[in-house]
């Protein structure tokens, strides 16, 4: 896999990967950016959410679980000093499923986190999961709830 990020002006860059799609990146105005794109750390977080989200949809489809909504909310904590890397990331999976087998939905999330999501395996931050099915929290590995 390859990507190229090209400077445009000030702190604005345009990235393009093997897929050919462009992504605009920029810094906040306070440090010289013009707010013309997402921040690099936001993209890292969105990439993680997209990676695990795609896994979840594929796994739910294979399990023949129908769903109306799959949202992945990511809450990241960063170190206070440079390089201000992510130290903890909580992923909350909000899934509206029709006649859902909650255990299978939790299994789909665990498979993504433990086996399939290459983005999560590329990060050194501590990751934790919360699963919400049809508006009800059914799993939270931060609270050591029963699996």
Regions found by a protein language model. Name each.
Residues 1-46, 57-147:
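Extended beta-strand/beta-hairpin segments
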């Amino acid at each position: 896999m390859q990507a190229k990020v090209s400077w445009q002006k000030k702190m604005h860059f345009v990235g393009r990967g093997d897929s050919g799609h462009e992504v605009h990146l920029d810094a906040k105005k306070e440090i010289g950016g013009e707010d013309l794109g997402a921040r690099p750390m936001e993209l890292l977080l969105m990439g993680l959410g997209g990676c695990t989200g795609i896994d979840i949809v594929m796994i739910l489809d294979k399990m023949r679980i129908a769903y109306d909504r799959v949202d992945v909310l990511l809450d990241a904590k960063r170190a206070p000093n440079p390089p201000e890397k992510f130290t903890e990331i909580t992923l909350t999976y909000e899934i509206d499923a029709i006649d859902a087998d909650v255990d299978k939905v939790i299994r789909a999330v665990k498979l993504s986190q433990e086996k399939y999501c290459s983005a999560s395996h590329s990060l050194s931050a501590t990751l934790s999961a919360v699963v919400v099915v049809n508006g009800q929290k059914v799993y939270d590995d931060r609270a050591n709830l029963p699996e």
